[in-house]
């Protein structure tokens, strides 16, 4: 059958547009009987008549619509004006605008050749049988096709009595009006013929079925293809008559043909019979089929009346004349609109276009030219007969046919086509089978072992099916995906499609191969993020069998619904105890981004042959006995508890109640159903049916678990034990033993007391009765016993803290206690009994005991009154430290309390104190030195102050002040309205100012009651200006050093309580070393070279008193300082203490960011590193050539070491016990980061996780220092259970430990990156503090507290609102890098300029580095590149600023405008009244898959789901020069999690070097592999500046320990000398 041409849209003309087609007239008549209101009737009729109206009328109708929408016109007025307009301009009464066409012998719109009826007859499946004709009913797409329709009754002609548009427009019955003009060539014969045709048409009108449906299709096609024509002349009538004669001849022969049968197996065999017939019977306005001229003669059917040469010549001349006439008419009419322009015009008008009819079975448009299935293969047989063929048999006479009766044979199938029961080619992946639509297929079946895709050796089959299931297989890493059909008789593996089915199957193959990529990727990367998935998609080469050059992100989004469905199907084939891979982070991101609908029926689609091995990714964890004991013995008890809680809550959280999965009944077959009472089970498990587990709720729970606790509410601090009502003491029960030790302050102290005949003395431990009897007994150490003046018998309790009251919670050892800084005076009557608490000191050989069998029992613990402790616990900071070594003296041994002493020291340290007084004048005391928090401040010292402490004379504008918003053209920028918030992620708009800095000129305070009032100390100081505080504003600070200041003689008086710390400010010319060496010599160092005069706004030479800090201020001129000023306290220079570098093992090292920071801090020498990923391991080797890098599994290496091996299989030397002094690393949380509950299913994975392996490394090697780095959510995973167990293991080993969250942006990088850090120090070492922030940063990104079990924990950091230095910006980071284009791949290029900022100078280094490496960026697809080009270059711009225009891409493809065809109930209409919705879900309905749009400049998926995801703010966003990077990820994608990855001024994503700089890597640092490998190395790394800051804190601990050791050695030497 020749391909039919698509209906052509023609412009409306001022000349007559032709009469109405028959189907329109019939529909108009039906409307009168539908009982519609006047408004509905008008709307429906306008819908039908719209394309037949003239251009001028359409324009006026659109104006009326606009006025109606803007409420400038009432609804009644609108209807009246529409009627008036049409009656005035389109009425027949004026005789000028007739819409009818003269009956000149031209073929009618409704005419239809005989072959179409026969085609409809024969195109049915065997299941479709003739049905009895029923009474006439309104035509619809769902009418059943008629089988036996007379060919002569099908061909109809248009009557000369045509109904006008206005006659149909008015509501009410309409009568036909006879035509007044005489028709040319109207003879008695033609009139009789017309009467016959009318009669036949009336017969056809009463029929329902195939003939009516096909006739309706042809009438639509003919009506839409009808173009403007000149009045036909007499010769046109003659040609038409001759053509009609040929048609009648063909019909007679067709009617007489006895071989024609209305069966699907024969309906295509006679297809060629109608080819010539179709060409000869086409309407005059229909273009000639060009393929007809090229057909060979043997293809023409013999029964067709031959066309004479004269007829062909006349036809060709007629065609030429019609083309010429059309060109003349088009030159005077409105130009033809493009498809996108027509859609845009229609979106503004309420009047929709006429919907083309659809097939009631497959739902496809009947005017699709490629709709029909052509023909069956030769000698095709039915399925049962085909299956009995010997060609398909693989068994011999001795073989068993089936193993069981339930088994089905499996064959291969090639040259196949799939079609519905009406013969329309159908895809199988659009949900038709799931909707129970019967699909059949034909082709050639072959034996299962035959892999030749040709039809040779096979047997042809027809009408196989219907298809019960279609399935996929081959997710095993191979090249091919197997696609199969299942019928009631057999299963078929598809090979190659037929030629006609190839385009449909090609689209299906693309989405299937993408699904294969996704499933196989997630098998080994269950924790991959969206950017990782895009990386995999874009780097996979498509197979040659599909017509696709490359896979892109747009390909994934286009097929997202299908891909997610396949992943869900894959999960259904897995075991119940396996985590669904569709809950992985990348799949959840895809679901949200593409707006995928979950929970749809998948019963007819399955995944076969899943070959993924269980727990394939990590090997079984190698654990030490201590770690194994904690995880496998104790924690299993907690698992049972959480399992019980999960089961109780399972039914509540398993349903959303909306999706199809939730609404379907229980299957009755799964494990959960079989346990239900209704299916005969016990009902104990209380689990939902496995088939009804809601995917929407699972995704929501997984999303909730990943959300960080940014806004941590204020939690109550841990309650201290307060004594309740005083108990009435029983003197008989309590009595003092012995004489009083001391009488002091109305208290008589004793050493011993008897309680219930049990002796208790100072230093013993007791259990105390709580006020609430439901709580367990409190435990305390008795530090004092006394009786007050009122006879109350009291004791002082230093409380122990149970493990359950610490951050460890339920994971703690029930026998382990912790000392805390809390104590209280209590009545002796509260004591319950005496208990035994043993101090468990670390053994002398502690470091070498790693990996051995730990002690599991505590002697005497069976009595229930024996406990042990080994650490002090700080409840506010969650720090476990070694207990203080303070010993009692003779003066305080009767009341020695560690808690009291510690609290007294803290209070004494925090209180301001005057150290040296100079003089007193008028009641004011002038001082030379004061102290606070252990820091001494002297005259001439420089101090930090909060930004509000004083102001400057120069008013500086904000560096990121936004310009006023101009009005936006919403037609061009339809998504701009979503930018209602001024907040821009990555902006420093709300970043605080850094500390003010001043030099102390004068210290004074008042007197109170004759004493110095130390609570009211004032400082007079000189102000230092930062560059941004001068008139040069922030532009002046960009090029200067970040620690450069300007001297000023301006003074300010501040409170000493406002001082935040001390710093060093030196005049640059007075330094004995370079400014760079001085700045890097220690923390808090500044310099100045000039003074700033704010009055003249000039920079001057500093005065002498600024250059000579030794000349102290005079205290209002009344005295002079004594001696030379000392900038800092006298202390031993650091250079005098030689600190050997710690021998370090870096596990999960990546490219080496953590080690690089420790190297910069000067504390570490990384001798060993473990990294399985080869590109990262190679990068580590490039930057650390002296390091032994292992590329093996860490579990394998630890197993070798524990077995006593010295080298690995490659001969590399393994570190032995005692070699490793520092262990650092960031173990991936692979396999257990998806959900926030521990249960028996996920527990087994956690036991084998890399966190457990890393802790086993720590236990075996027992390093001096241990650091674990991970994502911020590490502290929140699984009810914080991962954090608790990690700390529990460290405590059990004997380590001091703590945890905290740090923001990398506060340590000198232009990036927000919060990281969880766990620090541990061996017994005898000092546990490091977390480093204080160095730079100010956006407060929104600095929420660093953590809530565990409803308790809020913070770190020791005190700089919460400001910092010493300003924030580092994107401009500081990369403004000096040369410009490159999208896809730049040159790994080495010149800098082409000097560094412009302090940060750039630091990263370039002092060495000569003429080559810039890794300044390369990803080559984005043409569509993404076009979007990037259209993102504006102003701050905060993103996808919402894209114009809605049509663009030609770099590959020549056209990117279309996005069409808005739905009302968005949430966002309303635009200012122009345009719609804002792109899917039916915007109206509150279910999503319509047919609403999807692709290859548009504005990505369709973003406005589709924007209302639910904060309008996708930041996607396709540009970085801001004065802002910062979002967390650098492993693959910069414009639509990825990071969001703003576009260069501020260039149309590309950020380069590898720019990302590396955002992490703080120096330019000399090398990366390895392709561009995506390098991006991944950078994104996974720890920012070296953050690691350096932590390393410097470890260095302070080492220095402190070294000083104490040196002091102890000196003291011991002196004592030895004294003895001698």
UniProtKB/Swiss-Prot annotation:
The SAM-dependent MTase C5-type domain, residue ranges: 1142-1601
Cross-link Glycyl lysine isopeptide (Lys-Gly) (interchain with G-Cter in SUMO2) per UniProt, renumbered positions: 255, 1611
Modified residues (N6-methyllysine): 139
GO biological processes: cellular response to amino acid stimulus; cellular response to bisphenol A; chromosomal DNA methylation maintenance following DNA replication; DNA methylation-dependent constitutive heterochromatin formation; DNA-templated transcription; epigenetic programming of gene expression; methylation; negative regulation of DNA-templated transcription
Composition skew (Basic residues), residue ranges: 126-137, 719-730, 1113-1125
Domain of life: Eukaryota
Binding-site positions, Zn(2+) 1: 656, 659, 662, 694
Protein name: DNA (cytosine-5)-methyltransferase 1
Species name: Mus musculus
Gene: Dnmt1
């Amino acid at each position: 059958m020749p391909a039919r041409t698509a209906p052509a849209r023609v412009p409306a003309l001022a000349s007559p547009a032709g009469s109405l087609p028959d189907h329109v007239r019939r529909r108009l008549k039906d409307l009168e009987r539908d009982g519609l209101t006047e408004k509905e009737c008008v709307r429906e009729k306008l819908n039908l008549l719209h394309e037949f109206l003239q251009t001028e009328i359409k324009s006026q109708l659109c104006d009326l619509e606009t006025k109606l929408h803007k409420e400038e016109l009432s609804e009644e007025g609108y209807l009246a004006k529409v009627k008036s307009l049409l009656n005035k301009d389109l009425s027949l009464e004026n005789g000028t605008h007739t819409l009818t066409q003269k009956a000149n012998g031209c073929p009618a719109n409704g005419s239809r050749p005989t072959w179409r009826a026969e085609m409809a007859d024969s195109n049915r499946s065997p299941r479709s049988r003739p049905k009895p004709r029923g009474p006439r009913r309104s035509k619809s797409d769902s009418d059943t096709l008629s089988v036996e329709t007379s060919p002569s009754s099908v061909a109809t002609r248009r009557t000369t009595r045509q109904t006008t548009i206005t006659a149909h427009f008015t509501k009410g019955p309409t009568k036909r009006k006879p035509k007044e003009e005489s028709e040319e060539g109207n003879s008695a014969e033609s009139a009789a013929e017309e009467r016959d045709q009318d009669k036949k048409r009336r017969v056809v009108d009463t029929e329902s079925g195939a003939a009516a449906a096909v006739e309706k299709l042809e009438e639509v096609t003919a009506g839409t293809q009808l173009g403007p024509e000149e009045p036909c002349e007499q010769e046109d009538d003659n040609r038409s008559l001759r053509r009609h004669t040929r048609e009648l001849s063909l019909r007679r022969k067709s009617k007489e043909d006895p071989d024609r049968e209305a069966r699907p197996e024969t309906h295509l065999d006679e297809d060629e019979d109608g080819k010539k017939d179709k060409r000869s019977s086409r309407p005059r306005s229909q273009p000639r089929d060009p393929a007809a001229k090229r057909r060979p003669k043997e293809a023409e059917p013999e029964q067709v009346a031959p066309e004479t040469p004269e007829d062909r010549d006349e036809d060709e001349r007629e065609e030429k004349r019609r083309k010429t006439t059309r060109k003349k008419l088009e030159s005077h009419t409105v130009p033809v609109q493009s498809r996108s322009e027509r859609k845009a015009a229609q979106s503004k008008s309420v009047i929709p276009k006429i919907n083309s009819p659809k097939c009631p079975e497959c739902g496809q448009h009947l005017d699709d030219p490629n709709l029909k299935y052509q023909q069956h293969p030769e000698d095709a047989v039915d399925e049962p007969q085909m299956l009995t063929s010997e060609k398909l048999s693989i068994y011999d006479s001795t073989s068993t046919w089936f193993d069981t009766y339930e088994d089905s044979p499996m064959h291969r199938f090639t040259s196949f086509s799939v079609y519905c029961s009406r013969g329309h080619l159908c895809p199988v992946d659009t949900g038709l089978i799931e909707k129970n639509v019967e699909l059949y297929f034909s082709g050639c079946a072959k034996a299962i072992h035959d892999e030749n895709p040709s039809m040779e050796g096979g047997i042809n089959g027809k009408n196989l099916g219907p298809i019960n299931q279609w399935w996929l297989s081959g997710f095993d890493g191979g090249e091919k995906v197997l696609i199969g059909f299942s019928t009631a008789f057999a299963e078929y593996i598809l090979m190659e499609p037929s030629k006609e089915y190839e385009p449909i199957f090609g689209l299906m193959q693309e989405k299937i191969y993408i699904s294969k990529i996704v499933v196989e990727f997630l098998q080994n990367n269950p924790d991959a993020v969206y950017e990782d998935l895009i990386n995999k998609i874009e780097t996979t080469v498509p197979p040659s069998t599909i017509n696709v050059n490359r896979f892109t992100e747009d390909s994934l989004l286009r097929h997202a619904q299908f891909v997610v469905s396949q992943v869900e199907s894959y999960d259904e084939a897995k075991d119940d105890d396996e985590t669904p891979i569709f809950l992985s982070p990348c799949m959840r991101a895809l679901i949200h981004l593409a707006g995928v609908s979950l929970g749809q029926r998948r019963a007819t689609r399955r995944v076969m042959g899943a070959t993924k091995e269980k727990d394939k990714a990590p090997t079984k964890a190698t654990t030490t006995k201590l770690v194994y004991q904690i995880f496998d013995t104790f924690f299993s008890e907690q698992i049972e508890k959480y399992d019980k809680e999960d089961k109780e809550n399972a039914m509540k959280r398993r349903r959303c109640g909306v999706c199809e999965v939730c609404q379907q009944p229980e299957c009755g077959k799964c494990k959960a159903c079989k346990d239900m009472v209704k299916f005969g089970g016990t009902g104990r498990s209380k689990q939902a049916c496995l088939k009804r587990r809601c995917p929407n709720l699972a995704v929501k729970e997984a999303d909730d678990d990943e959300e960080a606790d940014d806004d941590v509410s204020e939690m109550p601090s841990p309650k201290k034990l307060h004594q309740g009502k005083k108990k009435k003491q029983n003197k008989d029960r309590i009595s003092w033993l012995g004489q009083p030790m001391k009488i002091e302050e109305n208290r008589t102290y004793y050493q011993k007391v008897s309680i219930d005949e049990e002796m208790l003395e100072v230093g013993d431990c007791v259990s105390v009765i709580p006020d609430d009897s439901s709580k367990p007994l409190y435990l305390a150490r008795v530090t004092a016993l006394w009786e007050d003046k009122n006879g109350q018998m009291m004791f002082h309790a230093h409380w122990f803290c149970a493990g359950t009251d610490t951050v460890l919670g339920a994971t703690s050892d029930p026998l382990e206690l912790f000392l805390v800084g809390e104590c209280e005076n209590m009545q002796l009557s509260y004591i319950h009994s005496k208990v035994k608490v043993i101090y468990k000191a670390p053994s002398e050989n502690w470091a070498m005991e790693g990996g051995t069998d730990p002690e599991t029992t505590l002697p005497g613990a069976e009595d229930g009154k024996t406990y042990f402790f080994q650490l002090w616990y700080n409840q506010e900071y969650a720090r476990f430290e070694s207990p203080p070594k303070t010993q009692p003296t003779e003066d305080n041994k009767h009341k020695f309390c560690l808690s009291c002493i510690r609290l007294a020291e803290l209070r004494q340290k925090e209180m301001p104190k005057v150290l040296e007084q100079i003089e007193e004048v008028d009641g004011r005391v002038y001082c030379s030195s004061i102290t606070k928090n252990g820091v001494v401040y002297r005259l001439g010292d420089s101090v930090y102050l909060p930004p509000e402490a004083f102001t400057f004379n120069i008013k500086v504008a904000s560096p990121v002040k936004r310009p006023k918003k101009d009005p936006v053209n919403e037609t061009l920028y339809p998504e701009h309205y979503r930018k209602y918030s001024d907040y821009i992620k990555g902006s420093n708009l709300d970043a605080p100012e850094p500390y003010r800095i001043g030099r102390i000129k004068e210290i004074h305070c008042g007197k109170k009651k004759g004493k110095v009032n130390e609570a009211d100390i004032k400082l007079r100081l000189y102000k230092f200006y930062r560059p941004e505080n001068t008139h040069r504003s922030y532009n002046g600070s960009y090029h200067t050093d970040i620690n450069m200041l300007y001297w000023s003689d301006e003074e300010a008086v501040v409170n000493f309580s406002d001082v935040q710390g001390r710093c060093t400010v030196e005049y640059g010319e007075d330094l004995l070393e370079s400014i760079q060496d001085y700045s890097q010599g220690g923390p808090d160092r500044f310099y100045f070279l000039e003074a700033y005069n704010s009055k003249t706004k000039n920079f001057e030479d500093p005065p002498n008193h600024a250059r000579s800090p030794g000349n102290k201020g005079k205290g209002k001129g009344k005295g002079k300082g004594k001696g030379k000023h000392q900038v800092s306290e006298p202390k031993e220079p650091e250079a005098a203490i030689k600190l050997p570098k710690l021998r370090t093992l870096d596990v999960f090292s990546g490219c080496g960011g953590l080690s690089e920071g420790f190297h910069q801090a000067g504390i570490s020498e990384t001798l060993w590193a473990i990294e399985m990923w080869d590109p990262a391991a190679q990068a580590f080797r490039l930057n650390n050539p002296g390091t032994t890098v292992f590329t093996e599994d860490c579990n394998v290496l630890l197993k070798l070491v524990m077995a006593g091996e010295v080298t690995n299989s490659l001969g590399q030397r393994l570190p032995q016990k005692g070699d490793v002094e520092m262990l650092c690393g960031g173990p991936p949380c692979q396999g257990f980061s998806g959900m926030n509950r521990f249960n028996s299913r996920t527990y087994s994975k956690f036991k084998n996780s890399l966190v457990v392996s890393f802790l086993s490394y720590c236990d075996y090697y027992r390093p001096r220092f241990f650091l674990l780095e991970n994502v911020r959510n590490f502290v929140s995973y699984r009810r914080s259970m991962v954090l608790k167990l990690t700390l529990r293991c460290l405590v059990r080993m004997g380590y001091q430990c703590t945890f905290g969250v740090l923001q990398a942006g506060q340590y000198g990088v232009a990036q927000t990156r919060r990281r969880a850090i766990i620090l541990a120090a061996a017994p005898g070492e000092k546990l490091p503090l977390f480093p204080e922030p160095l730079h100010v940063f956006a407060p929104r990104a600095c929420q660093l507290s953590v809530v565990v079990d409803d308790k809020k924990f913070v770190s020791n950091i005190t700089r919460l609102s400001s910092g010493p230095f300003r924030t580092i910006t994107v401009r500081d980071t990369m403004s000096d890098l040369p410009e490159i284009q999208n896809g730049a791949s040159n790994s080495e290029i010149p800098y082409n300029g000097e560094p412009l900022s302090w940060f750039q100078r630091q990263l370039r280094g002092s060495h000569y580095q003429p080559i810039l490496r890794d300044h390369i960026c990803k080559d984005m697809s043409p569509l993404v590149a076009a979007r990037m080009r259209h993102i504006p270059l102003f701050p905060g711009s993103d996808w919402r600023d894209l114009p809605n225009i049509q663009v030609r891409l770099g590959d020549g493809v056209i990117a279309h405008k996005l069409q808005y065809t739905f009302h968005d109930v949430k966002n309303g209409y635009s200012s122009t009244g345009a719609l804002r919705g792109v899917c039916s879900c915007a109206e509150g309905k279910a999503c319509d898959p047919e609403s999807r749009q692709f290859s548009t400049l504005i990505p369709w998926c973003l406005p589709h789901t924007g209302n639910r995801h904060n309008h996708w703010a930041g996607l396709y966003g540009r970085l801001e020069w004065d802002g910062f990077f979002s967390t650098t990820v492993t693959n910069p994608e414009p639509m990825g999690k990071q969001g703003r990855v576009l260069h501020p001024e260039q149309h590309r994503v950020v380069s590898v070097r720019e990302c590396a700089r955002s992490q703080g890597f120096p330019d000399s640092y090398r990366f390895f592999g392709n561009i995506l490998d390098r991006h991944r190395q950078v994104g996974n790394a720890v920012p070296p500046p953050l690691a350096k800051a932590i390393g410097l804190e470890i260095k302070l601990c080492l220095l402190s320990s070294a000083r104490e050791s040196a002091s102890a050695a000196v003291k011991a030497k002196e004592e030895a000398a004294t003895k001698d």
